[in-house]
C-alpha cells in the first residue's frame, strides 16, 4: 500500500511540472540577422536633379555589410554591389558617375532620367548573420509642369448656345492632372458641365447667363502644381447680341464703301498727273530743240540782210501794199527836216532781231548823200491814175529805201566800231 501511494505522488508531481517543460520546449531560440528600416517608402524625383534612397540597418555583427541595390523590372537590373562603401565589379554605363553609396547602405542617384523611375530593392547581409535583410523603395521621376493656358474659340458666346468648349493646354510636364475653377472655386457638379476622360477639356452645354464668369485650370503632377491665368467668358442675350452685330456690320460696310470710293479717284488722278508730267517733259524738250535751232539760224539771217540790203528791201516792198497807193506822201513821212548836215532815219519795222540795237547817240551824215534825200522830199506829187507816175514813184521809193538801208548799215558799223 505504501509503495502504491508513493508511485501516485510521484506521478502527480510530474503532471504538475509538465506545462513548464512544454513551455520551455516550444519557446524559440533568438536567431542572429540584419534588420533594415527606411524613413520613406516613396520618393518623387525631378529630371536632372538628385534623389536619395535612404535606409538604415542594424546587426549584432561588427563586420562590413555586403550591400546590393537592384531595380525591379521584368528582369532585375543590378544597380550597384559593394562591401561597405567599396564598389564591387564594374558599373553599368547608364549608372556610371551617377551613384554614391553611404555607410548605412543608402544610395544617392544624380542627374535623374525618366528611365530611373521604378521600384528599388536593397539587400544587406553580414557573414556572421544567418539571415539577410531586405527593403524596397519606390522612385518616381517627372518633368515639372509649365504654365498652362485656357484656349477658347471666342471669349463671347450667345445665350442658349448648344455647346461651348474650353481647353487647358500646356507645353511641358509628365503625369498631369487637371482641375477646373470657376471664379477661383472648383466647379460644382452640374449636368451641363462635361469633362473629357483626362479632364483636360471642359464643355458647357446649353449656355446660360449664369455661365458668364472667370474660368481657369490647375495642372499638377507629383512634383509641381501650376494655375493658368483666368479667362473671362461673356454671355450675351440674343436680343442684345443681334443689335451689336447689326451695328458692327453696318459700320464695317460704310467704312468699306468709303475706302473704295476714295481709293478709285486717287488712282485716276495719279494716272492723270503722270500723263501730264510726261507731256510737259516732252513739250519742254521740243521747246529746247526749237530754241536751239532758232539760235543757230537768227545770226545767219542777220548777216544775210547786211550783205544783201536790196533783197531785204524787195521783200519788204512786196509785203507792203501802201507804197503803190500813196507814193508821194510816204517819203515825207519817213524823214523829218532837221538841222543842216543831219538826217533822222526812221526805224525799220521788219528788222531782224539778230541785228545790233542802235544807240541813242546820233552821228552826222555825209554831205554827198544828203542831196538824194533832199530830192526825195522835193519831188512833186503825181496823180495816182497815171502809169508813168506810179512807175517813177516806185523807182524813187526803191532808191530812197536802198539809201536808208545803206545809211543804217553804215550807222550800225559805226556803232559797233564805237
From Swiss-Prot:
Name the major location.
cytoplasm
Q: Transmembrane segments in this chain: where? A: 241-261
User: Residues in domain Ig-like C2-type?
Assistant: 148-234
Residues the record lists as Phosphoserine modifications:
280, 321, 352, 379
Protein location: Cytoplasm; Cell membrane
Q: Which InterPro entries match?
A: HEPACAM_domain, Ig-like_dom, Ig-like_dom_sf, Ig-like_fold, Ig_sub, Ig_sub2, Ig_V-set
List the source organism.
Mus musculus (Mouse)
Extracellular side residue ranges read 34-240
Know the name of this protein? Answer: Hepatic and glial cell adhesion molecule
Membrane topology per the entry is:
Single-pass type I membrane protein
Q: What is known of its domains?
A: The cytoplasmic domain plays an important role in regulation of cell-matrix adhesion and cell motility.
Query: Known PANTHER family for this protein?
Result: HEPACAM FAMILY MEMBER 2-RELATED, HEPATIC AND GLIAL CELL ADHESION MOLECULE
Xref: Pfam families:
Ig_3, V-set
Q: Which PROSITE patterns match?
A: IG_LIKE (PS50835)
Would you indicate the residue range of the signal peptide?
A: 1-33
Q: How is it modified after translation?
A: N-glycosylated.
Q: Enumerate the glycosylated residues.
A: 35, 138, 167, 189
Per UniProt, the ranges with Basic and acidic residues bias are: 287-308
Tell me the subunit arrangement. Homodimer. Dimer formation occurs predominantly through cis interactions on the cell surface. Part of a complex containing MLC1, TRPV4, AQP4 and ATP1B1. Interacts with CLCN2.
Amino acid at each position: 500500500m505504501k509503495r502504491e501511494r508513493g508511485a501516485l505522488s510521484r506521478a502527480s508531481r510530474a503532471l504538475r511540472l509538465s506545462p513548464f517543460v512544454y513551455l520551455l520546449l516550444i519557446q524559440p531560440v533568438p536567431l542572429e540577422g540584419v534588420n533594415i528600416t527606411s524613413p520613406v517608402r516613396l520618393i518623387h524625383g525631378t529630371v536632372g536633379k538628385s534623389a536619395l534612397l535612404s535606409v538604415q540597418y542594424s546587426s549584432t555583427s561588427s563586420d562590413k555589410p555586403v550591400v546590393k541595390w537592384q531595380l525591379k523590372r521584368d528582369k532585375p537590373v543590378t544597380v550597384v554591389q559593394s562591401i561597405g562603401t567599396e564598389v564591387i565589379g564594374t558599373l553599368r554605363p547608364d549608372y556610371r558617375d551617377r551613384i554614391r553609396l553611404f555607410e548605412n547602405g543608402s544610395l544617392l542617384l544624380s542627374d535623374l532620367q525618366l528611365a530611373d523611375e521604378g521600384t528599388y530593392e536593397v539587400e544587406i547581409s553580414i557573414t556572421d548573420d544567418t539571415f539577410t535583410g531586405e527593403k524596397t523603395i519606390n522612385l518616381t521621376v517627372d518633368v515639372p509642369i509649365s504654365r498652362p493656358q485656357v484656349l477658347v474659340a471666342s471669349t463671347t458666346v450667345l445665350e442658349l448656345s448648344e455647346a461651348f468648349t474650353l481647353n487647358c493646354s500646356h507645353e511641358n510636364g509628365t503625369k498631369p492632372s487637371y482641375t477646373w475653377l470657376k471664379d477661383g472655386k472648383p466647379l460644382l457638379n452640374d449636368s451641363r458641365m462635361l469633362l473629357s476622360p483626362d479632364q483636360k477639356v471642359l464643355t458647357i452645354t446649353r449656355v446660360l447667363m449664369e455661365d458668364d464668369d472667370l474660368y481657369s485650370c490647375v495642372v499638377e503632377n507629383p512634383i509641381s502644381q501650376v494655375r493658368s491665368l483666368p479667362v473671362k467668358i461673356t454671355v450675351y442675350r440674343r436680343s442684345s447680341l443681334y443689335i451689336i452685330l447689326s451695328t458692327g456690320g453696318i459700320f464695317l460696310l460704310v467704312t468699306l464703301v468709303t475706302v473704295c470710293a476714295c481709293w478709285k479717284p486717287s488712282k485716276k488722278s495719279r494716272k492723270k498727273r503722270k500723263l501730264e508730267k510726261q507731256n510737259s517733259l516732252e513739250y519742254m524738250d521740243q521747246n529746247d530743240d526749237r530754241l536751239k535751232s532758232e539760235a543757230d539760224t537768227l545770226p545767219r539771217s542777220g548777216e544775210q540782210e547786211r550783205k544783201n540790203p536790196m533783197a531785204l528791201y524787195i521783200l519788204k516792198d512786196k509785203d507792203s501794199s501802201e507804197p503803190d497807193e500813196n507814193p508821194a506822201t510816204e517819203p515825207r513821212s519817213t524823214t523829218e527836216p532837221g538841222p543842216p548836215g543831219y538826217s533822222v532815219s526812221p526805224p525799220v519795222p521788219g528788222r531782224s532781231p539778230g541785228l545790233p540795237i542802235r544807240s541813242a547817240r546820233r552821228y552826222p551824215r555825209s554831205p554827198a548823200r544828203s542831196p538824194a534825200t533832199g530830192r526825195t522830199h522835193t519831188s512833186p506829187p503825181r496823180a495816182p491814175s497815171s502809169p508813168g507816175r506810179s512807175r517813177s514813184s516806185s523807182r524813187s521809193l526803191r532808191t530812197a529805201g536802198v539809201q536808208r538801208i545803206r545809211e543804217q548799215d553804215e550807222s550800225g558799223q559805226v556803232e559797233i566800231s564805237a
